[in-house]
Amino acid sequence: MLFLLFITSLACYGFGIILAKKARKGQKAIFFFAVVSMLFPLLALKYGGFAFSILGIPFTHSLVIPMGISFYTLQFIGYLADIYKNGQAPEKNFIRFFLFSSYFPQILQGPIPRFAQLSETLYQEHEFDGETISYGLQKILWGLFWKFMIASKAAVFVDNIFNSQETIAGSLYLIAGILYSFQLYADFLSCVFLSQGISLLFGVRLSENFAQPYLAFSIKDFWRRWHISLSLWLRD
């Protein structure tokens, strides 16, 4: 995972500098090539085996997909898009850029950070702040509570119903379906709390990524509330 992340970070860092130096006329081709290069590892690892089978080529190896690859791929594309579309200045220091790309509290479940937003707090000096540490620990405890006391408990009932070999009443399937949606909610919310809490221990506040999606009034509003940073990424 770290090797691929390092190589992809190095490529994105280089593309960012090249994009900024290139005249506007030549930027489009560079940007297109850069985006394809960022997507290639993700697509190759996720769909490489399927592509070989379609082509009739025997492929018996098991591809291991690194954790967080989807998030940091979108993060890199967003960084390059900000340089290409919005004229954002690229980061010239690779160590600082790699810190941005590999900041582990958000790399597994998001949010998908914008460089200008995360770098504001990531690169500044941090002093010990008891109040921030305390708030971070509260977030972590809430994350563990939602994961083990709610999501895991709901999963036991849901699995027992859907995996049962016996005849089950339709009402129980309905209840299991509702509980499954709540299980997904609790799972994602727990990850949000954990990533935010761990980041606060380092003095870095992550953006909100979850806003009570089950209170949405439309599918569009639901999606916007479920994964805020991804919705903003797609919009921009």
Predicted segments, located by residue:
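Membrane-embedded transmembrane alpha-helical bundles that form the catalytic cores
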Residues: 1-236
